[in-house]
C-alpha cells in the first residue's frame, strides 16, 4: 500500500503560470522525493502599468512516502 503526502506551496514567475508551477516542483524536488502530481489550487497575477508582471500560484504537490525498512 502506498502512502501519499501533500504539501501546499506558493510560487511565482515573471513569465507565466506554467513556469511558476515548474518552479514549485523544482524547488520541492530539492528536499522531497517521489513527487507524483501538482494541483493548481489558485492563481493570480500582479499588474503594473496595465501589464501582468508576476504570475502567482497556490499549489498542492503530492508525493509518495517511502516505507521505512529499518527493523
Whereabouts are the PLM-identified features?
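Short beta-strands and strand-coil junctions in structured, solvent-facing domains, enriched
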Residues: 16-17, 47, 68
Amino acid at each position: 500500500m502506498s502512502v501519499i503526502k501533500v504539501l501546499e506551496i506558493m510560487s511565482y514567475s515573471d513569465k507565466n503560470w506554467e513556469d511558476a508551477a515548474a518552479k514549485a516542483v523544482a524547488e520541492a524536488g530539492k528536499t522531497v522525493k517521489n513527487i507524483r502530481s501538482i494541483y493548481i489550487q489558485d492563481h493570480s497575477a500582479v499588474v503594473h502599468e496595465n501589464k501582468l508582471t508576476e504570475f502567482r500560484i497556490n499549489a498542492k504537490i503530492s508525493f509518495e512516502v517511502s516505507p521505512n525498512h529499518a527493523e
